[in-house]
Amino acid sequence: MKKPNLRLQSAREVIAALSSGHDTLVLMDGELTHQDHFTQALSEFVTPCANLLGGLIATGGETARGVLDTLGIDRLQLLGEVRPGLPFSVTEGWLRPLPVVTKAGAFGPPDALIQCRDFLRDLQHSSRAAAQNVAAMQEK
């Protein structure tokens, strides 16, 4: 059984990247034939970063489920699609509402992940702008 190869060397690197506002990709290579190995490896990188997540893109059916389970996300409310076949949801009953895009492993065009990332970035920028407008209106 091959252990996953994580591109980032430590959870500290993930936390540092997220803390400085960078989009961060955690890529797991290798054959994960046992769910416990996958969950343990994923937990080491994702769980300490949960409060820093501004959005989440999870790919692959079992992989996406593993990511959501590891974070303690058990309910999503479907809000729409980034594009056909790429559902956009928000967490329910989690630490806070978190935008989530899920993608079947081999589904979509070559730039599907970039489209998902751009969608979440636009959503985050829109949310910040709306919050700033509300704050400005409350000051008046």
Pin down the residues of each PLM region.
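Active-site catalytic microenvironments in core metabolic enzymes, especially phosphate/sugar-handling
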Residues: 1-140
